[in-house]
Amino acid sequence: MRFHTLLAGASWMGEYGNPEDPVEGKFLRSISPYHNINPKTDYPEVFFITSTKDDRVHPAHARKTAKRMEDQGHDFLYYENIDGGHSAAANLKETAKRLALQHTYLMQKLRDGK
């Protein structure tokens, strides 16, 4: 667990805890989506959205979680905008694209019941 070494991650330790502290690190791993992906669990298809230029939550978090899902055979979708920032949108066109992707995903899940 290295969120505190990437970009603004160190500023989150006051709110979330210090992963290097044995007690806090154990708790953080217990609630970490990445650390709790189970190959035997049947998850719904997850949609990861991130931005290459996110300076608050490093895109490596989404990348490595998607990779773990892939390695374990879970279905997922992944979209990484190369511009933008924390909101994954650099301008109105990119915002519209991201919202269209999100709404399409949601509507398909509601329609298909999966």
Region spans (language model):
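Active-site-proximal cap/loop segments of hydrolase catalytic domains
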Residues: 1-114
